[in-house]
Every structure is written in structure tokens, then in C-alpha cells.
């Protein structure tokens, strides 16, 4: 699936449960709901309990995209400066991490941190941005996940994890293949995910556990392309699966820590997705079911019109085992 514009050149309890190996089981997923579906292209969702951030085209047809933020109950506002383009990455509290694209040819890309409540930039630690192409950023708990290097080029592509407090940096993956890509997905709690195709369409999704320092390759169905991963705090990964080409048997999937991959929703024919973003909703009584709202942008392959939808995926946390006598 191709991407719009230059993007690709672009909770304590749950954390504790994941750390000790508690498994959650699927309950149900809701029907897809439109989130942003206006006359302009709207892509690249990111969300928190109180904020939603996305990119919107300046014209009804394909055109440069600006980044907008909207607090619940308030009007949206533009985030990126004039004469730039931008894509959302992730929201952690009121801090937004995003990709800023500059230059007449949109050939320069860096990462930014932004205070949504105060509406101003925050300092980015030295060494995150370089003269190379940084993109595809995500943020959680003081860790920044991002990509460096142009995909489908002779660049050395890196998937990096950077601690914004200590400066520790981990290289999660790397690739040098002019027919491939290594692209960061999302970090949530102690889990990070990314995609590597070497070459495309031979693609795999990886899940990294920060606590143990281990990487797991997700199972892939033979002959299928997998892409656009996101992850929640319990390690469940959401992604797209399809045949090669736009809108070819596209299936939004979920892969829990244990068990087989499952379909979470249906997609109309000749539709495809580019970005998924997983946000864990606040728990509701009795507390044994947790819900992840999965946002995704969807494109009509013939008209190239983009909208944003969401689906709620619920999982049940089993009761704790009785103490050993």
C-alpha cells in the first residue's frame, strides 16, 4: 500500500500485568465509527483521553497537509508553522510528538515535541534530529520511538528508541535495501512495534519488550503483506494485512501476546489503511474488561480520498490466581 505524500520518507496496572505474563483474552470489537470524514483528506491519527491530533489537506484533493489538534469540547487549532507540513506521532499526557517537513521540495524532516495545553514547542534533546530524514515518531513514558533514513533508498535505515531523560539510545533494527523499508510504528508502556520489508513485499512486524529487552517477530500468513502496526500497553498489536496493491483483500488484524491473530473489523472493497494508532480507554467497572480504541486512516484507492475511523477492541483480564496454600 502506498502512503500519502512524504510521510514515510517521514497505565501502571496493565504494565504490571504484562510484566508478569498475565494474558488478556478478546471479548468483542465494535463497528467502525467515522472520526474525521470531511471533504478534505484527513490522515495520521493520534489520540489521548482528552486530545485528538491529525493531518488535514489544504485543498479537497491531494495537497500539502497541516497538523491539527483538538481538545474534547473545543475547536481544533493548527500546530505546524507556515510553509511546512506535519504528521502526528503520539500524545503522552499533553505532550505531542510529531514530524515536521520543510523545504520547497519537502526534502527535510525532523521531529518536534509540543505542549498541547500551552501551545508551544518543547526542547528536543540533542542527537534526535540530524541532517538525515527522521520520521514516524511515537512517544510513551519518556521513550521516543522513531525512524531515521529514507525508505526505498540506499540510505541506512534505522529504527531507534531514545530515552528523553537519560539519553540512552537503542537501535532496534536497521536496513540498507533500496527496495525495502524499516519504519517505526508505536510505543505504548513497555512495548514498541515496527515494520521491516526486505525487500517489499516481504514484510514482517516486530514487537519489542523494553522490560526484558527481547524482540518477537509476529507470525505472518504466507503470501500476505503486513504493515502499519500499533500496540497497546498489554502488548496486543494492531496492523493491516493484505495482498500486494492498494485495497487488495485488506484486513485490519489484532495479534495478542498469546494466541492467534484475529480480524477486528471488515473493510469495504478497494479501501486500504496507512496508519493505525492504539489508545487504551479509561477503565470502567467492574474493571475486568479493558478497551483499546484503534484509530486508522482509510483511503479510497480509486479517488485517493482519505478519512479517519476508529473501532473499539475489548479484552478481558482474567482474575488473579488464588494464592498457593
Regions found by a protein language model. Give the residues of each.
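Secretory targeting and sorting signals
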Residues: 2-32
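An edge-strand/N-cap motif at the start of beta-rich repeat modules
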Residues: 28-69
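Multi-bladed beta-propeller domains
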Residues: 29-40, 72-84, 117-131, 165-180, ...
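Repeated scaffold domains used in trafficking and secretory/extracellular systems
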Residues: 39-48, 83-93, 129-141, 177-189, ...
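Residue position within the beta-strands of beta-propeller blades
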Residues: 52-55, 96-99, 143-148, 192-195, ...
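Structural motif
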Residues: 58-68, 102-112, 149-160, 200-206, ...
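Loop/turn-rich, solvent-exposed surfaces of beta-rich toroidal or solenoidal domains
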Residues: 223-254
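Blade-level signature of beta-propeller repeat domains, shared across WD40, Kelch, NHL, RCC1
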Residues: 273-325
